[in-house]
């Protein structure tokens, strides 16, 4: 019955609304390896051996028909030893892996799981029990191989080894047999049409999710010393780890933190769950396996999907959607999107309807047709058509198609795009030096200014706007002339939108006037004062005595005169009176000093 059907395969994946894409899919089609149990009989003449010797009582007449039944020597001589005379068909491998805690485990399973399975002893056997045992051994071998790669995987934010793991749902089609193996919550659904006269195709769940709350899984976990804890309505396997502040060997007195960690009871990877007392993994890598005999007249669809699909689309709805899509394609001639892409888009739409952040969603849809396609094996943009009897070969290395769906996370901004504006002026801009206005030492003056050669720098409006973007607050650069003591230049950029370097922004004053301005400076309007300060009258900044006379002896000759000091005192008194007038009615004035008796 082999060769009486063809397969139409479509695959699609979407990141959803998650920050990382951890779903991977894999499709491999390659010639079936030779059987181990019953090797094909090869004629002795083809191997260059003499014919069967004549036994006693066996005449030439009995030997002749036996020799006549052998194939022609020249026809079989071209075949190598141990090979069957008939053409071998191909075996198809399909896998969906949903990673967690990082993409490393899912990527490793996609690249190596099929290789570990097919090299196990008994996989090419004709007995289904031996094939299932070989598949289980392949899962365990892949899991142990991850242990050797653990040191190469990136560590967690706390510096611990990687906690990466993955679910795995595998379908292997060889001849008329379909082998299913899975760990985790990625499921496989089979569409069966019971009555050929009835168009209804019912959905059969081939796999059962490995959840920690299942009695069988909970009993196994607790038997290994683990536990299951409910967190936010979800049952999770508990990770028992020493407290992060602990260093050294783990003893009985070591504080152990119990963290509800993983929502599946079986997975590949998750090496953190190894129990040293029992020598087993609390999160088991051993898969559940099953065997199904395909009947092209009854079995119509095989769907592999991650939990992002099955959490939103029930199995029966998924089968009905695929059936409707195929009817539109073949009966009405509409060449729309593939079944896998349609299912993923429907799932993403339901995530949005429920106002939830969509999970990574992946699907592989296999449509079984009872008629062999005369077009042979070919692929198009969305689908792959296979006839396994023609020994096709296919290997999908990049089947995870990243799409820009409405639920997808926007791409990360490239590092070349600098969000901060940069100055593009060709003129030389002096470095900004921060100093205290009342420090004992003034800024060093450039030689050009010391000689009295002060050049005015003209900036364009474009450069000034760029400078204002980097200087949102008013910035004052004061250059004190410690040699001539004649001028003090202040460069004051403002926050106005149309700012240019004009005479208003370039202020020149004598050292005496600069000192008076520093003394008379008042706080801004939004400055908060305490109760004691408000009761003691207007606020005045106290300046240090002889703050400007400590620099050098050459500066003593240019100190302000007595008349200038009296003028500054008058300005200070005016400021005080002006502040008192703003307080309003004198009857409402508060006392300068208030004593509270409790």
Swiss-Prot record:
Residues 65-74 have a biased composition (Low complexity). Its EC number is 3.1.3.16. The keyword Nucleotide-binding does not apply. Residues 564-581 have a biased composition (Basic residues). Pfam families: PP2C. Gene3D superfamilies: PPM-type phosphatase domain. Residues 49-74, 398-419, 509-584 are annotated as: Disordered. Its cofactor is Mg(2+); Mn(2+). This is Protein phosphatase 1D. It comes from Mus musculus. The lineage of its organism: Eukaryota, Metazoa, Chordata, Craniata, Vertebrata. The gene is Ppm1d.
């Amino acid at each position: 019955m082999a060769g009486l059907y063809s397969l139409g395969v479509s695959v699609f994946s979407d990141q959803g609304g998650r920050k990382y894409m951890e779903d991977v899919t894999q499709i491999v089609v390659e010639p079936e390896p030779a059987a181990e149990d019953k090797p094909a009989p090869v004629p002795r003449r083809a191997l260059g051996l003499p014919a069967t010797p004549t036994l006693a009582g066996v005449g030439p007449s009995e030997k002749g028909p036996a020799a006549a039944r052998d194939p022609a020597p020249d026809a079989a001589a071209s075949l190598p030893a141990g090979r069957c005379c008939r053409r071998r068909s191909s075996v198809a491998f399909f896998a969906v892996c949903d990673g967690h805690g990082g993409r490393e485990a899912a990527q490793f399973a996609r690249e190596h799981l099929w290789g570990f399975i097919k090299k196990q002893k008994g996989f090419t056997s004709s007995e289904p029990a031996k094939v299932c045992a070989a598949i289980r051994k392949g899962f365990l071998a892949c899991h142990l191989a991850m242990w050797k790669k653990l040191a190469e995987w990136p560590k967690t934010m706390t510096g611990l080894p990687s906690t990466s793991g993955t679910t795995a749902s595998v379908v292997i089609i060889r001849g008329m047999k379909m082998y299913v193996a899975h760990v985790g919550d990625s499921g496989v659904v089979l569409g069966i049409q019971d009555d050929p006269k009835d168009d209804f195709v019912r959905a059969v769940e081939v796999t059962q999710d490995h959840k920690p709350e299942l009695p069988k899984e909970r009993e196994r976990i607790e038997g290994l010393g683990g536990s299951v804890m409910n967190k936010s309505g979800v049952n999770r396997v508990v990770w028992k780890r020493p407290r992060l502040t602990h260093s050294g060997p783990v003893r009985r007195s070591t504080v152990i933190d119990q963290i509800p960690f993983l929502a599946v009871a079986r997975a590949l990877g998750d090496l953190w769950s190894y129990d040293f007392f029992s020598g087993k993994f609390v999160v088991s890598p051993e898969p559940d396996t099953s065997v199904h005999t395909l009947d092209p007249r009854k079995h119509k669809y095989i769907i592999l999907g991650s939990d992002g699909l099955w959490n939103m689309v029930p199995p029966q709805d998924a089968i009905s959607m695929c059936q409707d899509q195929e009817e539109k394609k073949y009966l009405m001639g509409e060449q729309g999107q593939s079944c896998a892409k349609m299912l993923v888009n429907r799932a993403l739409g339901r995530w949005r309807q429920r106002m939830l952040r969509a999970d990574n969603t992946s699907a592989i849809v296999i449509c079984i047709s009872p008629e062999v396609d005369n077009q042979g094996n070919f692929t198009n943009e969305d689908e792959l058509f296979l006839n396994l009897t023609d020994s096709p070969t296919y290997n999908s290395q990049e089947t995870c198609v990243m799409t820009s769906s409405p639920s997808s996370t926007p791409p990360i901004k490239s590092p070349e795009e600098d969000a901060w504006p940069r100055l593009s002026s060709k003129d030389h801009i002096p470095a900004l030096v921060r100093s205290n206005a009342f420090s004992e030492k003034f800024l060093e003056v450039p030689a050009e200014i010391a000689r009295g050669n002060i050049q005015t720098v003209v900036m364009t409006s474009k450069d000034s706007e760029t400078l204002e973007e980097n200087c949102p607050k008013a910035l004052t650069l004061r250059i004190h002339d410690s040699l001539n003591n004649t001028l003090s230049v202040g460069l004051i950029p403002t926050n106005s939108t149309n700012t240019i370097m004009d005479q208003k922004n370039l202020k020149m004053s004598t050292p005496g006037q600069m000192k008076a301005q520093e003394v008379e400076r008042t706080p801004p309007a939004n400055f908060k004062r305490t109760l004691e300060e408000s009761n003691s009258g207007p606020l005045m900044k106290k300046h240090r005595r002889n703050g400007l006379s400590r620099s050098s002896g050459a500066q003593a000759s240019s100190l302000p005169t007595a008349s200038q000091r009296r003028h500054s005192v008058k300005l200070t008194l005016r400021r005080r009176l002006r502040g008192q007038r703003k307080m309003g009615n004198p009857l409402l004035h508060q006392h300068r000093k208030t004593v509270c008796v409790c």
